[in-house]
Amino acid sequence: MDIALKEKTDTEMVFVVSGVTVPFINAIRRICMMEVPKLAIEYVNMYRNDAKMFDEVLAHRLGLVPLAADPEFAESLKMPEECDCEEYCSECSVSLTLRKKGPGVVYSGDLVSETPAVKPVYPDIPLVKLGDDDELELEAVAQLGVGREHAKWEPTTACAYKYYPRIEFSEDCDECLECIEACPRDVLGEESGKPVVVDLENCSMCKSCVRACDKRAIDVGYEEGKFIFRIETDGSVDPKDVLLKACDILRDKAEQVITFCEGG
């Protein structure tokens, strides 16, 4: 198996992996989405809400606010099902408070965490509008969870792969260049009067170029066992950490099967 990193930011990672099968790469994708733990608001204690918005709606909005947590702090928290408490405690949760008086808009940045290790990723997410003399006071309790339980715990906003494209020109090409105009993603270009591939990895294999070529001189396909994998997050977890954790989870599952087969 070979892996080549193509792009990496705080919220996105793109890499090319070859020498693997669809079931393997799809297992990584599903674990990234559904089984990698992430911190999100689970409980809201509403002490005062004068806004023209139901408590339940506001609580739902709070649950979808992305929270950035220091990796070491997040690792120290217990999963709720592993904790001995009834609902939440300091070992499995972190508290955020919000107090604001109108008029004005309440933003995610108004949430004050009990620890500097946890804070909203984006401070400018509008939550609710307060009128004159309206007040809002609440406590939000964040816990670890996984995406299969609720979308708010999904660390990825997009996690997908596609086959690595392949484009070939035959000797029948009459250099009409119609294929270049037909390509919607600027994958093809011109060089010395001939069509050439200039951005292969951007190809979606839509075959618009094939349909535009009367000579059928273009063959568009994919390389077997080679994929372009893209991970995007909401900023709460680094995409590299998501991938590493997903691999750890997959390895643990495989080791459990091995132990079972060996009769352990």
Curated annotation (Swiss-Prot):
Entry EC number(s): 2.7.7.6
A Pfam family this chain is assigned to: RNA_pol_A_bac
GO cellular component: cytoplasm; DNA-directed RNA polymerase complex
Broad class of the protein's primary localization: cytoplasm
SMART domains: RPOLD
InterPro entries: 4Fe4S_Fe-S-bd, DNA-dir_RNA_pol_30-40kDasu_CS, DNA-dir_RNA_pol_insert, DNA-dir_RNA_pol_RpoA/D/Rpb3, RBP11-like, RNAP_Rpo3/Rpb3/RPAC1, RNApol_insert_sf, Rpo3/RPB3_RNA_Pol_subunit
Keyword Nucleotidyltransferase: yes
Principal EC category: transferase
Positions annotated to bind [3Fe-4S] cluster: C203, C206, C209
Compartmental location: Cytoplasm
One GO term of the biological process aspect: DNA-templated transcription
One MF term in the entry's GO annotations: DNA-directed RNA polymerase activity
Protein name, entry field: DNA-directed RNA polymerase subunit Rpo3
Keyword Kinase attached: no
Function summary: DNA-dependent RNA polymerase (RNAP) catalyzes the transcription of DNA into RNA using the four ribonucleoside triphosphates as substrates.
Assembly behavior: Part of the RNA polymerase complex.
Organism: Methanothermobacter thermautotrophicus (strain ATCC 29096 / DSM 1053 / JCM 10044 / NBRC 100330 / Delta H) (Methanobacterium thermoautotrophicum)
Keywords (A to Z) from UniProt: 3Fe-4S, Cytoplasm, DNA-directed RNA polymerase, Iron, Iron-sulfur, Metal-binding, Nucleotidyltransferase, Transcription, Transferase
Disulphide bond pairs: none
